């Protein structure tokens, strides 16, 4: 494309921004998904900016699940800022996602312009921003790590390109180091810079290595630091390293296909690692890698650099086994290379027109794909249709039915999931919950106990404690609730349950009422709603203002009894009888709890 006037280019930039907004405007109220539950919804540490210093010293602040507590303080900080603006309403988080995407696009334009020229660079950046396969990264708020780390790496490239001072002083590495606080794979900057110097700047291999050496040393130091900062409980979740490795070439082929034709997108694949190196799919993957290497060797320099970027970006998640062999948010960073390669060929006006139409098609497809991410039910209905062998997907779809009160349907989905993942502790927890809702307490308890036997993590202890509490067995629940909180201090649910149970046995409450009357009436309302924990807290507050209220002692005793705190209930009734010895209601309630011998 011939050079364009500045006003025309700025108009094209405005149009590109409008296209990105059009693609993602419908996602603003999409709900939280996947890891968002423990990174955002149940994470106490994002609820106050007072915790900001702790984000940078303790990986447990990233997630309420210790096994997911990886060191990503920049992500946690950004989420805390979103929470400060809107609590747990999804919209502020999605607004930030779109803002970060636009910033990524702006950096891509700056980075690519010196390689391809302005309009091809703008096309590449816009394609990246509206590409339908990137919808997972945009809708999965906890995947913000991909956005932030990409921004850090791109900013380093732009500084390297455009500032002699930054290049001579190595200040271009500062954004890279900051981006590493969002996600470790930014350490691939060194091989990318080597490729850039070799292919784009036409340096010799020795010169390119000398240029990349400072970033290589920084990358190694960052990797060591980040690994040491991860919580000791953190788990990557990977299985056999060999099986995982021989599967990845086919996964790369799949990712490349998604770039060309993003159909069949699924939020949770049912793929598993290949058992044999000679699996037909594995062989197809090897052939793809060979063709990729051949293309890098023969393609024009910008295309070769883009293809190299694609390969290098995928190496960290390909060499180190992870829980899933393929994930669509892993392609976000890798696709930067592919959009560069594609844009290199947009050199004529007719191709520019075709490229514009192509962008509009992608924007429309992205808008439609965002509707799948509208809520948990729409998402998991899509996943079970596209990944029917995924037991976790069937379980999560069952959870959406349980949330609607469709317990029988939820149980059927859970039971189907059990045929696919028979020893999945989280599934056992959910079977326990649904059996409890269906009234089969014996079956519910079996499932909760099996979950504890399979994996006694915070969720197993917490959900068993909640069930025990609701069954009037709070004294048994309290040790499990405390264990859940010990394992995960960041868990809002565990902390809230422990607080309620400890208030029941005389601990300090968190709620305040201005006087006896308001506290007593709040206790009555809680009794009517069968909210025993609140009733206990309110009546204890009332008694702190009027310890001679026999009615408050009676209501406290009744609430304690419903939770199973028998001894505490007896003491409350006896206190009431000391005040009003002839109160027949107090006497009758006491006999129900402690009948005369």
What does each model-found stretch correspond to?
Residues 402, 429, 436, 469, ...:
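Position-specific recognition of the canonical hydrophobic site in helix A of tetratricopeptide repeat
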Residues 391-392, 425-426, 458-459, 492-493, ...:
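Helix-start (N-cap) detector for alpha-helical repeat units in TPR-like alpha-solenoids
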Residues 1-439, 456-459:
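Polytopic membrane enzymes that build or remodel cell-surface glycoconjugates and lipids
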Residues 388, 422, 455-456, 489, ...:
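Short coil turns that delineate tetratricopeptide repeat
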Residues 399, 433, 466-467, 500, ...:
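Residue-level recognition of tetratricopeptide repeat
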């Amino acid at each position: 494309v011939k050079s364009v006037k500045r006003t025309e280019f700025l108009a094209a930039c405005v149009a590109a921004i409008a296209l990105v907004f059009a693609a993602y405007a419908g996602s603003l109220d999409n709900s939280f998904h996947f890891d968002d539950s423990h990174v955002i919804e149940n994470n106490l540490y994002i609820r106050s900016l007072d915790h900001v210093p702790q984000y940078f010293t303790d990986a447990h602040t990233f997630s309420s699940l210790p096994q997911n507590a990886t060191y990503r303080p920049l992500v946690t900080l950004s989420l805390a800022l979103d929470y400060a603006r809107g609590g747990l309403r999804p919209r502020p988080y999605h607004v930030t996602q779109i803002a970060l995407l636009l910033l990524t696009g702006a950096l891509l334009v700056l980075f690519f312009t010196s390689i391809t020229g302005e309009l091809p660079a703008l096309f590449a950046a816009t394609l990246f921003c509206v590409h339908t396969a990137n919808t997972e990264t945009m809708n999965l708020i906890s995947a913000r790590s991909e956005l932030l780390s990409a921004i850090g790496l791109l900013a380093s490239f732009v500084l390297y390109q455009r500032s002699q001072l930054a290049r001579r002083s190595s200040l271009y590495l500062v954004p890279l180091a900051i981006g590493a606080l969002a996600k470790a794979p930014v350490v691939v900057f060194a091989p990318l810079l080597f490729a850039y110097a070799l292919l784009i700047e036409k340096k010799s291999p020795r010169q390119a290595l000398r240029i990349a050496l400072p970033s290589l040393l920084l990358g190694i130091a960052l990797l060591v630091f980040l690994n040491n900062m991860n919580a000791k409980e953190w788990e990557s979740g990977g299985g056999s390293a060999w099986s995982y490795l021989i599967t990845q070439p086919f996964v790369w082929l799949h990712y490349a296909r998604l770039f060309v034709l993003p159909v069949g997108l699924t939020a949770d694949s049912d793929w598993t690692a290949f058992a044999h190196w000679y699996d037909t799919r594995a062989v197809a993957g090897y052939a793809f890698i060979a063709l990729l290497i051949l293309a890098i060797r023969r393609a024009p320099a910008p295309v070769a650099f883009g293809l190299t970027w694609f390969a290098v970006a995928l190496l960290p998640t390909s060499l180190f086994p992870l829980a899933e062999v393929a994930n669509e948010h892993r392609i976000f960073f890798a696709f930067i290379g592919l959009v560069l390669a594609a844009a290199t060929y947009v050199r004529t006006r007719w191709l520019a027109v075709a490229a514009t139409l192509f962008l509009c098609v992608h924007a429309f497809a992205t808008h439609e794909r965002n509707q799948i991410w509208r809520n948990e039910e729409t998402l998991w209905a899509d996943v079970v249709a596209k990944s029917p062998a995924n037991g976790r997907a069937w379980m999560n779809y069952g959870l959406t039915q349980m949330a609607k009160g469709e317990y029988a349907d939820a149980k059927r989905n859970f039971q189907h999931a059990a045929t696919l993942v028979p020893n999945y502790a989280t599934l056992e927890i959910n079977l326990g919950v649904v059996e409890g809702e269906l009234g089969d307490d014996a079956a519910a308890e079996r499932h909760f106990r099996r979950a504890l036997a399979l994996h006694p993590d915070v969720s197993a202890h917490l959900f068993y404690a909640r069930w025990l509490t609701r069954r009037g067995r709070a004294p048994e629940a309290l040790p499990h609730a405390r264990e859940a909180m010990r394992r995960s201090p960041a868990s809002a649910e565990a902390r809230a349950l422990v607080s309620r149970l400890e208030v029941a046995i005389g601990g300090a409450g968190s709620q305040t009422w201005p006087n006896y009357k308001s506290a007593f009436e709040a206790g009555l309302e809680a009794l009517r709603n069968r909210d025993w924990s609140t009733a206990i807290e309110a009546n204890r507050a009332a008694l702190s203002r009027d310890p001679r209220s026999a009615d408050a002692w009676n209501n406290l005793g009744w609430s304690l009894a419903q939770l199973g705190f028998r001894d505490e209930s007896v003491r409350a009734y006896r206190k009431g009888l000391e005040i009003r010895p002839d109160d027949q209601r107090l006497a009758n309630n006491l006999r129900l709890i402690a009948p005369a011998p």
